[in-house]
Amino acid sequence: MEDDDFSIKDKKENYETCSTETISSYISINEKCQLIEKDINDDNHENPYMIFNKISSSLIAMLQGVEVLCNLSIIYLLKDNYHLHPASLSIVMCFIKIPWSIKLVWAVISDNYPIFGYRRKYYLLLGSFLCILSLICLGLITHNNLFITILLLFIYFFGSSLCNVIGEAQVVESNRNCSINSSARNVSLFFAFRKLSFAIMSYLSGYLLLLISKKHIFLIGSFLPICVFTSGFFIIEKRNYTKSSIKDQIKCIYSIIKLSYLKNFIIFIFIMMSTPSCGNTLFFYITNELKFSPNLLGKMAMFQSLASFISIISYMLFFTKIDIRKLLLYSTIIITPFCLLPLVVIKKVNYFLFIPNTLFFITDTVLIEFIAEFQTMPILVLCSRLIPEGFESTIYSLLLSSNNFASIISSFLSSLLTYSLNITSTNFTNLPYMIIICCLTNIIPIFFLYILPNHSQKKNLQHSNSHTQKYYSYPSTDYISSQKSDSSEITKFSADMQIDDITLE
């Protein structure tokens, strides 16, 4: 499809123009529903996506960089101040990131319970305020109580996850009237800003640890949440969203995710991200055994983030049209051998190749990160186009929550594997076996690629039109009603507009 997905003005067919209330009534009677097409007046076309919204979403994208800035400080704090072992560290890191695994809860709340008539603004202010409060407290208290430290970290990750829900909803809303290329550009730019902040913060995280204390880094990290908090006051958003009952919302969510293409994406994302990893265990090996300095670790993380950034830009420019099955298959096949490369350092084979440990680890992590980013971007782009209007936070957060929940499962499996192999902060005898096991489990997602749609299966999604339509109109009575909306819109429905026009290119 060469024309924009939502622009079909040049078609010869007649459209019946009606209000959103009429559409809702029509849907309740007629099971052969058609997809809604919204034609926004030119003079208001820029209103939902004003520059302030773009600045806000960009700052939210960069907010996760604060986590990267403080990540080494957090790990060293738990490792040195509280003397946690690798398995215990993995469990603590899992616990404090639980808010990210249940982002769906925050999304449902923000979609259904607007604060003072706004679904985005005040939730963003609340989340950024919690980030500011927790980071300032972490920078001021004396760290001699593990419970208080974990609680403050938990509050920070809760605030950042809430901000992230709002930022992702803004990105999805900006994709509402875009072609597949524009959607790929919007999503790619959002994550490119995130990875760029990762690269900057990764370098600073190691460099600053050599100059200042961990508590000072927490205080410095509060600057970006302050910027996000300030930007929240300038968000352009329509008011008068009515409250929807949680029961009705859950019914709608359940009916939406029963659609095969959404359900299969959730299953595949979970399988792909739930395999065990040896990342935290390798951290203990390279710090305790290889004596890597914090500055070097920061540089490694910086190169890793730069690789992700370049990968995202490359995907945006060259790979948006590649079939998702082929992309995931080839990337998995390519990345699997690189997962075994740490064995070369552990067995000291690299000395025979005259490659130092530092260069070897940096090269390995950069290559893995570059290829791995190709596995996530097409899924994120496609998911952002499958989401019905009014469910921007809920469904996108559901899809990404499966990613975060799978990461927690991965951490628990990694902890269990670390414990069963008797790997400690000083005993790395069985580390090669753990690396091999983790590498083999990376192949598992290949066997589930068949559940994802390919180009030849696009037309098979057309039967989902009648099921999807009512969720496109579910919140529209109050969201785009001519009586309650701040913008002037014309709502139309088209009998020949197909589901693949908005989901797959």
Swiss-Prot record:
It is a multi-pass membrane protein. Transport of folates is inhibited by probenecid and methotrexate. It catalyses: folate(in) + H(+)(in) = folate(out) + H(+)(out). Pfam families: BT1. GO terms for molecular function: folic acid transmembrane transporter activity. The chain crosses the membrane at residues 58-78, 89-109, 122-142, 146-166, 192-212, 216-236, 266-286, 300-320, 326-346, 352-372, 405-425, 431-451. The keyword Lipid metabolism does not apply. It is found in: Cell membrane. Its main location: membrane. One of its GO terms (cellular component) is plasma membrane. Glycans are attached at N177, N181, N186, N240, N427, N454. InterPro entries: BT1, MFS_trans_sf. The keyword Glycoprotein applies. Keywords: Cell membrane, Glycoprotein, Membrane, Transmembrane, Transmembrane helix, Transport. Belongs to the major facilitator superfamily. Folate-biopterin transporter (TC 2.A.71) family. Folate transporter with broad substrate specificity. Transports folic acid, folinic acid, pteroic acid, dihydropteroic acid, the folate precursor p-amino benzoic acid (pABA) and the human folate catabolite pABA monoglutamate. This is Folate transporter 1. It comes from Plasmodium falciparum (isolate 3D7).
